[in-house]
């Protein structure tokens, strides 16, 4: 059935800016597919956002962004802003709700969950990050018990950070890539890559440490959010041959990463998913990641990459040394399980679940059953 769906993106920055990380990536990839399938799709986003495709409407909203939840303390209080873009985005959604069959927020914002019962149109929530702030977790818990059919996560590992959620019964949406846009590269250069926002919780210094030990060139790509953190990495590891490419479009990023022997994922927090992981795999680049969070469900240890203990630089270094033992074709095969079509299928099931509800959560057992929590 064709649906009219209104999405609300992250309020931290415009679509296309890189500030919203994986939330942006997912919406930019997903909404054109849903529109081509005949759904009427729109997005509420901060002003300055790009349009994912001509058939996806974007409501542009002015306002001040909220603080980053990714760097918050657990006891951070909830503060509403009179000129806040988050507040104005949900105000707009309430004004236009009669034009839509479902409203889907991709967020980790207290206000979004609080407002759920005040809408006439069903509101679904895709929790965008792992448990971070106590007050936000509490409102999620309250609304989850009231509206259990209205919640989804990115991965089982993310769901497991919330003690009131059963990872095996909560729908995990994962992510998706347009495989046609990713060319397999069997013969990369002897370089390593790292792709994420330049921010302390992403653990860039660990990639610097490995590059210095092995004297390998390091390609770094991502939004520069914390210049002081970047400067500190440079100062601590002055001998690293590092190239900072900035925040790149999909095609340029792909050319950089597929030309490296491995991509490192070294987050110092629980990564909810990791779109860059499946993007790297799609080009045949194995991923070496810490064995926690979303990447632990995406990387097949010893097949499409390696999983190592979190913050274990020795293990990370040894995994890079062994990377040429892997068949890069297996990385591409793993990425094929995360096609955009399957991603859109999961979203369509979730949207129907939000509208009608069901005794059973429509999980993707082929992906979720491999997680240790299930």
Language-model segment annotations:
Residues 1-374:
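Catalytic cores of nucleotide-sugar-dependent glycosyltransferases that transfer UDP/GDP/TDP-activated
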């Amino acid at each position: 059935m064709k649906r009219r769906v209104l999405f609300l993106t992250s309020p931290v920055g415009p679509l296309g800016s890189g500030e919203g990380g994986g939330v942006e990536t997912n919406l930019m990839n997903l909404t054109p597919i849903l529109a081509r399938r005949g759904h009427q799709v729109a997005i509420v986003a901060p002003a300055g956002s790009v349009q994912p495709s001509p058939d996806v409407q974007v409501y542009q909203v002015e306002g001040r962004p909220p603080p980053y939840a990714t760097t918050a303390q657990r006891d951070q209080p909830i503060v509403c802003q009179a000129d806040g873009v988050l507040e104005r985005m949900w105000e707009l959604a309430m004004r236009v709700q009669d034009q839509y069959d479902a409203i889907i927020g991709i967020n980790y914002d207290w206000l979004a969950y609080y407002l759920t019962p005040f809408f006439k149109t069903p509101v679904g929530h895709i929790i965008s990050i792992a448990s971070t702030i106590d007050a936000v977790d509490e409102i999620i818990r309250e609304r989850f018990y009231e509206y259990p059919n209205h919640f989804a996560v990115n991965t089982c590992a993310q769901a497991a950070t919330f003690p009131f959620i059963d990872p095996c019964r909560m729908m995990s949406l994962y992510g998706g890539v347009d495989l046609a846009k990713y060319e397999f590269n069997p013969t990369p250069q002897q370089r390593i890559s790292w792709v994420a926002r330049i921010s302390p919780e992403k653990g860039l210094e660990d990639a610097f440490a490995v590059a210095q030990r092995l004297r390998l060139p390091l390609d770094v790509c991502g939004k520069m959010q914390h210049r002081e953190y970047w400067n500190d990495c440079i100062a601590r590891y002055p001998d690293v041959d590092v190239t900072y490419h900035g925040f790149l479009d999909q095609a340029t990023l792909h050319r950089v990463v597929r030309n490296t022997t491995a991509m490192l994922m070294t987050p110092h927090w629980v990564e909810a998913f990791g779109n860059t992981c499946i993007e790297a795999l799609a080009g045949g680049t194995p991923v070496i990641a810490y064995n926690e969070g979303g990447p632990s469900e995406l990387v097949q240890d010893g097949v499409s990459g390696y999983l190592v203990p979190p913050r274990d630089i020795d293990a990370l270094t040894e995994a890079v040394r062994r990377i040429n033992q892997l068949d890069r074709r297996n990385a591409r095969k793993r990425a094929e399980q995360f096609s955009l079509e399957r991603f859109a299928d999961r979203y369509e099931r979730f949207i129907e679940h939000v509208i009608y509800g069901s005794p059973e959560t429509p999980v993707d057992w082929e992906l979720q059953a491999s997680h240790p929590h299930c």
